[in-house]
Structure formats: C-alpha cells, structure tokens
Amino acid sequence: MAAAGAPDGMEEPGMDTEAETVATEAPARPVNCLEAEAAAGAAAEDSGAARGSLQPAPAQPPGDPAAQASVSNGEDAGGGAGRELVDLKIIWNKTKHDVKFPLDSTGSELKQKIHSITGLPPAMQKVMYKGLVPEDKTLREIKVTSGAKIMVVGSTINDVLAVNTPKDAAQQDAKAEENKKEPLCRQKQHRKVLDKGKPEDVMPSVKGAQERLPTVPLSGMYNKSGGKVRLTFKLEQDQLWIGTKERTEKLPMGSIKNVVSEPIEGHEDYHMMAFQLGPTEASYYWVYWVPTQYVDAIKDTVLGKWQYF
C-alpha cells in the first residue's frame, strides 16, 4: 500500500524555509582570474580619472596677453599699476638709465630700484637730487619732476672696505685727540679769523634745524687766511668746488678723506668746518661761518652713507 501523501496543490510544511536557509548560507562563488583582472583594471581607471581632475591648468602660452598682464613697461614689478609715474634719468658710472618710477615711492624704494638696475647695493649708494635723497621721504615730497636727473655715486663693497677701514681708525684717533684739546675756536690759528666777526654777507642760519643743500653755492664764509670763500657742490661731476677771489679748486669728493666741524662759541648757529685733503691735519682746508642747518648735509654729500663701513 502506498504511503499517504499531501493533497494536490499543497506544499509540504518547512520546504520553503529550508530552501531559503540553504540559499543564505551558501558560500560565495569563487572569482576566477579573468574577473579579478577586470575588476583591477576598472579600479585603476577610476584612480587615474581622480588624479586627472587634480592636475593644474596648463600654463599660458608665451604670447598670451593674460600671461603678460603683470609685466609693465618700465614700472616696478607689482608696483606701478594705478600709481602716478615720473620719468627719471638715473646716472651712475657715466651710464644713463631711463626708468619710470612711482612718484609716491620713498628714497629707500628708489635705492632698491637702482640696485635692480646697476647691481649696486643700497647701502653703498649715494643718491642725489638737489642734495642727498632722504630714504624716508617720497619723491613727491622732495619735489622730483618728470625728466629729473638722479645722480648715483657708489663703489663695490670690496673697494669701500679697502679705502675706508684705515680711514675709520684715523677718524677715531682724531676724535680721541680732539677730546683732549681745548675747543678749536679758542686756538690761536682760528681765533685770528673768528675775531674778524661775521662776514657782512654771511648766509642766514637756523639753529636746531637740518636742511638739504641749497641749489645755489654756499657763500659768505671765510677761509683760514681771512679771505672770502664759497662752496659749490657739483653733483653731476661728483666734485666740490672751493672758490676764492683768486681761483677755484675743483676737488673730487672721493679724494676728501674726512670732514670735521665744531660750533663757534657764542655763535652756536654757525660752525667752523674743515675738509681733509691729505693724510694729516696739516692738509685741512678750514672754512668759517658755515650755517648750522647745512652741516650734516655737507658731510653726507661729501662722504656718503658708506663712510661708516
């Protein structure tokens, strides 16, 4: 006799549950070699696409105006756009350089520009326009106009050190010696000139002030012989002209070893000043009744900033 079975159309209890359990717990099918290589290739393409999205934009071609927009015609890099410019003629070592430069830039910035043109370090430069150009003032403040000539005097560091190291020692010795002496204006050789009194055409003085050299010669002074003397600063030739009634001495400023000065007792708004033209004090050329406001400008113009190196 056949065993009794389930009625037609009815499933035996538990069959679906067991099938689902078998399907869930069946181990993953092993991946063959071809499928593994395909997966690796797809990953590499995704990685390459990601890297490509991070690449920088291609550089502008050489002739592209956008690449040249930051380069101005004669202006400072990164400086002149939107600023008022003046045309300057910078003259150094008998060579003229025509440049455009912002009118509101300082003397210090002008030195940096000169450095970029000539290679002369700023500390070695003596920059002159109607006297020494102040580093902390703008070209507008010192009334520089378009077409102005800017004179530059300077030497290499090695040349300056070779010339000035002995000079520094000589200056220190001279100062130490002066401290031991009585004031210069009391010494007999100076007293005989000072006792004449002020020259009738002496220039006005401004006590406690420092001014740039005037555009005209300094006059109304005496020399050690009591004769009238005038000083003319020829900046373009880098010369000091010492003029008397008899003749005019034209001295290269680089030949002047030192400049000393001292206020005149009882007339402290005037100085007596000497230019050292040789190796000893005997070579001093004395000038009396120099207005005090020009003393520092004379020293800076003749000796330059590098005198302290």
UniProtKB/Swiss-Prot annotation:
Domain Ubiquitin-like: 84-159
Biased composition (Low complexity): 35-57
SMART domains for this protein: UBQ
GO molecular function: cadherin binding; RNA binding
Sequence ranges of Acidic residues compositional bias: 9-19
Amino acid composition bias (Basic and acidic residues), ranges on this chain: 174-185, 192-201
A Pfam family matched in the record: ubiquitin
InterPro entries to which the protein is assigned, alphabetical: UBFD1, Ubiquitin-like_dom, Ubiquitin-like_domsf, Ubiquitin_CS
Cysteine-cysteine disulfides: none
Region (Disordered) residue spans: 1-80, 171-204
PANTHER family in alphabetical order: UBIQUITIN DOMAIN-CONTAINING PROTEIN UBFD1
Function: May play a role as NF-kappa-B regulator.
Quaternary structure (record): Binds polyubiquitin.
Entry protein name: Ubiquitin domain-containing protein UBFD1
